[in-house]
Amino acid sequence: MKQFVTLFFVVPLTFVCVTNAQAHTRLAPADENFGRFGMSPLEITNRIHDAQVRGASYRGLMGMQGAIEDWAAKYPLDPWIAPREYLMSRLFAGLRSHDGNAEAAHCRAFLRTHYPRTRYK
């Protein structure tokens, strides 16, 4: 009887708990830091906005790109990543330089590879 209870009640309950835990880790916590410069998702968003308003530098964008790629590696299902990566590709292209164009192409390839179903292309 004890084996019956374990097999039919405890094992499915364990599966439900693990599934729920995975569902909660879909989004990155706002206070978790990514990349070499330790940027949170909110800081990345704010820096992208600042770069759109004030202008971007290649070095600053590369720091944000590294943080986004680190974020995507840890939370690949986070829906905040694809729109930010798209904006990064636009910012890199806006630099109008060989390095900027190459990095913009890298961002677009990253989107196609990691988020093929996104509307951000």
Where in the sequence are the language-model features?
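Positively charged n-region of N-terminal signal peptides that target proteins for export
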Residues: M1-F4
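Acidic, polar-rich low-complexity tracts and alpha-helical solenoid repeat scaffolds
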Residues: N20-K121
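Bacterial N-terminal signal peptides
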Residues: L7-V16
